[in-house]
């Protein structure tokens, strides 16, 4: 079992695998540069970035919806979500507005917050670099610095993961906005970026699952026990 966001990402990832297969079908797998196939590499970089962005948005929304549904009381909420409720209350001028969060009324406030996050998607998270991802998860579910979870002992520290992600997202921006980029895009770039994002998806989903478990005492998806 996995989150709905992960299932959607895995389905989208098949398109990337197909582009890599097309590259190999046309150019082979022997060492050496392939000319005339760079359009496949550029397309893959753009798609990987889009799928990474969509995954982050989806898992953040899924985590918030889980908290709204399963948190036992407002006391269990992360401080960042408590601040969100307090901010919305301050924006209301009616003196009785505070009573709307009594009992389970806070769930409605957070549901409204979820809808607002959905509306902000296109205009805010169109560059899914590490800072923007950190901001998204802090605002959506109260996780401080999501990118701090992106590390693999003996292989990569979180600072390096952030740097690599940001470089590839910048590359995607150059491709999308200028068409041609100063540096050519190779198949190695594609496979390296794809592997990085798959690793980031696993770490990000795991962090959200652990976070909502602490808040609600209920996992985002059930643990699969070996038979």
What are these model-predicted stretches?
Residues 1-46, 58-65, 70-79, 83:
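Charged alpha-helical initiation segments
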Residues 47-48, 55, 60-155:
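Helix-loop junctions and short alpha-helical segments
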Residues 42-43, 54, 173:
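Hydrophobic alpha-helical segments, especially transmembrane helices
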């Amino acid at each position: 079992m996995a989150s709905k966001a992960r299932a959607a990402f895995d389905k989208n990832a098949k398109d990337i695998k197909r582009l890599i297969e097309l590259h190999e079908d046309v150019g082979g797998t022997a060492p050496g540069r392939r000319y005339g196939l760079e359009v496949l590499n550029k397309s893959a970089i753009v798609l990987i970035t889009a799928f990474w962005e969509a995954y982050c948005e989806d898992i953040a929304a899924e985590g918030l919806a889980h908290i709204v549904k399963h948190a036992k009381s407002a006391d269990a909420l992360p401080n960042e979500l408590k601040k969100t409720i307090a901010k919305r209350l301050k924006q209301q001028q009616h003196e009785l507005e505070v009573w709307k969060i009594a009992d389970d009324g806070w769930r409605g406030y957070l549901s409204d917050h979820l809808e607002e996050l959905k509306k902000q998607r296109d205009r805010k998270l169109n560059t899914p670099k590490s800072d923007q991802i950190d901001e998204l998860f802090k605002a959506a579910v109260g996780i401080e610095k999501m990118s701090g979870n992106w590390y693999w002992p003996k292989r990569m520290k979180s600072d390096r993961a952030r740097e690599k992600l940001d470089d590839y997202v910048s590359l995607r921006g150059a491709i999308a906005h200028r068409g041609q980029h100063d540096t050519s895009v190779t198949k190695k770039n594609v496979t390296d970026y794809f592997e990085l994002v798959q690793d980031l998806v696993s770490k990000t989903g795991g962090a959200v699952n652990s976070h909502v478990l602490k808040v609600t005492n209920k996992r985002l998806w059930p643990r699969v026990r070996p038979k």
